[in-house]
Amino acid sequence: MTDRLVPQDSARTTGTRLRVLGAGACALFALAACAPPGGGSAPAASEAAPTDVSTELGEEPVELTLYDGAGLKAKDEALIAAFEEKYPNVTITGRYDPDDVQAQNSPRVLASDDPPDIARVIALSDVAGDGLLTNLDAYADAYNWDELPEGQLAQYRVNEDGVRGEGSQYTLADGFTVTGFYYNKELAQQLGMTTPPQTMDELQDLLAQAEEAGMVPIMAGNQTGGIVFTTQMMLNNALGAEAVNEWVFHAPEATIDTPEAAEAVGTVQDWAEAGYYPEDTNGTDATTALGRFANDEALFFFSGNWDAAALDEQMGDNVGFFLPPAPEGSEQATMSDPASNFAIPAGADEKDAAAAFLNFLRSEEARQVVADAGFAPSGEGEIPTTEEGSVNAQIQEAFAQLVEADGQVQFVQNATNGLTTTWNSEVQRLVDGATSPEDLLAAVQRQYESELGR
């Protein structure tokens, strides 16, 4: 979720800093808009759902094309280089559109007469329903992709009714974003915080102490939806990761307009009234909030891995990261979307080789490349090597905990194409006291159902 990206090299432990996801946290990964497919004939059913597949690439030269957003080029090119080193008979050429149009262009690219062999997909339900993607079930069986964490597999599946999280597999991601609390270690020490809070009660005690000490408890740029993050944190805790994901995935009769959700959103309103966010949060954007946090103006900053490089550079050892505390008796959960959710277009010529690339994304080599790029890696395995003590190292450890807890949750803003605007505006009104938790949730649910035609 960003408008500035990604690494320029893959150094692991040197002082070189990767330009990872920038502070404008709501552009690239929230681009869910999807234009109608363009020209090109619909693929045959046998192309869209192959059954005769192979995991062998042979020795003959194979040429593939990969399609993604330009901001992810450095990560992709590093993955391509690692794959080509392992499979020297395969050559992959990257093709990139500007980030702000890749989502709109993607359906036309997928439907063209000469589609790429590998393509990043955002609006999975739409393009799978249009028959533009290869059903990967046969490859999933061949490569044992069912061994992937269930929370990740859910992000790759869609059923015949367009409900995500179940049905056939159509994608496999190279890595993920991960969200949580950054904290200023020096300010934390002033409050007696020596380790991250383990419970919501401990977190709220720290917020109260910070406010009493004259600190800003949570820095947030709510002009660009910063408080939507803590709003979803409370919803994740109140409803559970599975229920929130079902809502984002369009499960039948799913609703977020419940008494439990209203109570959760009410806590966010209470925090605003208590002064736990900046007074000017609704007039502050994500980039400004990042800079103010880095300038020691707040104890906490809820954001994601896209801000790690900037904070590491500006704050050094003074910044830490932790996942949101879970309710008693529950597993940790937080927002974590795919970086590049790769599919194989139905009209692709080299499906077996493309599937081999998708499978490669689970390898230790690929996981290291993705971690070097500032993302959390796909699948499970050893935590990739990172600079000891860096905030990226803390993020990688936190993501490993999240995967073990099966706590990856989709961003609620991405449930439909138009919901980012609704969430942002309604949470701004909540902070201003211009709406209630109940009215906020009703407005969001109306927009959700309107876009889904329910």
Language-model features, listed with the residues they occupy:
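Short, solvent-exposed loop/beta-turn-alpha elements that line the ligand-binding surface or hinge
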Residues: 137-153, 222, 239-263, 313-314, ...
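Hinge/lid segment of periplasmic solute-binding proteins
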Residues: 124-179, 320-322
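Conserved N-terminal structural module of periplasmic/extracytoplasmic solute-binding proteins
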Residues: 2-130, 328-329, 369, 443-454
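Conserved C-terminal helix/tail region of periplasmic/extracytoplasmic solute-binding proteins
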Residues: 189, 403-454
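Long, aromatic- and glycine/proline-rich binding clefts that accommodate carbohydrate-like moieties
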Residues: 151-154, 322, 372-421, 429
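Glycine-centered hinge/linker elements that transmit conformational signals in sensory
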Residues: 207, 250-281
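Extracytoplasmic/periplasmic solute-binding protein
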Residues: 166-174, 179, 204-253, 298
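Extracytoplasmic/periplasmic substrate-recognition and gating elements
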Residues: 85, 167, 189-191, 274, ...
